[in-house]
Design a protein with these regions (language model features):
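Sec-exported extracytoplasmic/periplasmic mature domains
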Residues: 46-50, 69-79, 107, 174-184, ...
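Active-site His/acidic residue clusters
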Residues: 14-18, 146-164
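N-terminal, active-site-proximal structural segment of metallo-dependent hydrolase catalytic domains
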Residues: 1-77, 81, 87-91, 97, ...
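Active-site-proximal beta-strand elements of phosphoester/diester hydrolases
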Residues: 1-5, 26, 112-114, 143-153
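Active-site metal-binding loops of divalent metal-dependent hydrolases
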Residues: 3, 64, 151, 197-198
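Metal-dependent phosphoesterases centered on the DNase I-like endonuclease/exonuclease/phosphatase
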Residues: 165-226
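Active-site environment of divalent metal-dependent phosphoester hydrolases
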Residues: 66-68, 94-96, 154-155, 199-205
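Structured beta-strand-rich core segments of catalytic domains in phosphoester-bond hydrolases
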Residues: 58, 64-143
């Protein structure tokens, strides 16, 4: 879930967008506006609970500035009652935005987590990390591997940036291969869930790198115009 510029209201000097999204910045991103956004995000999560009868156990998020904004989201809204935990670290993204994972401790135990930085032409990109979190279900003990992505945008042109998005997808594909090869339950790719903002439509050419590994759950909806 891309939370779209979920910055705090302080100018911490952590990225190109940090000054813009601050109380004195061009966006006039004040504390009241920040906490209003927290409320709107929580309302969307509770809508899922109303729609499906249960709150999501796992939420992958993108475009968060730091751990603090997620802590405020969970403490300043009614989400504080539902035991969500945070997995996050600051990335080297030039805008100062990261990916993170929220999970309900009543449903999962965290086994492990790691980060991978995509490379392009042998050089690490100044982009978001790809986050891998291994969770164990408290109901049955099944292991799941969640991978949170926010691939490079089409800024500068779709064709010009395609190589960077392909490199990020190659990194994701390699991570899936590694996880499947060491699956203790012999499930292979079945316990792997990749999520996030891939900055492309579900029929993008780079998704072919995951053929035979993961199921593209958005492709049919996309073809139907949803």
């Amino acid at each position: 879930w891309n939370l779209e510029n979920f910055f705090d209201y302080h100018d911490n000097g952590t990225g190109e967008s940090d000054t813009e999204f601050s109380s004195d910045g061009s966006r006039r991103w004040t504390s009241s506006r920040f906490y209003e956004k927290c409320q709107m995000i929580s309302k969307s999560i509770f809508w899922i609970g109303d729609r499906y009868g249960v709150l999501p156990d796992v939420i992958g998020v993108a475009e968060v500035e730091n751990r603090w904004v997620l802590e405020r989201l969970l403490s300043s809204t009614l989400l504080r009652k539902y035991g969500y935990k945070i997995v996050h670290r600051n990335s080297q993204d030039r805008r100062g935005i990261d990916v993170a994972l929220l999970y309900r401790s009543a449903s999962f135990d965290m086994v492990d987590y790691s980060y991978c930085v995509p490379e392009y032409n042998g050089v690490r990109m100044n982009t978001r990390d790809i986050l891998h979190v291994k969770l164990k279900s408290k109901s049955g003990g099944k292991i799941y591997d969640f991978i949170v992505n926010h691939h490079p945008s089409k800024f500068g042109g779709a064709n010009e940036s395609e190589g960077r998005r392909m490199a990020a997808m190659e990194t994701l594909s390699s991570m899936c291969d590694s996880l499947a090869s060491v699956s203790v339950s012999s499930d292979g790719y079945k316990g792997i869930i990749a999520m996030g903002d891939f900055n492309d439509t579900p029929d993008g050419i780079q998704f072919s790198l995951l053929d035979g590994k993961l199921c593209n759950t958005c492709l049919d909806m996309f073809k139907e115009g949803e």
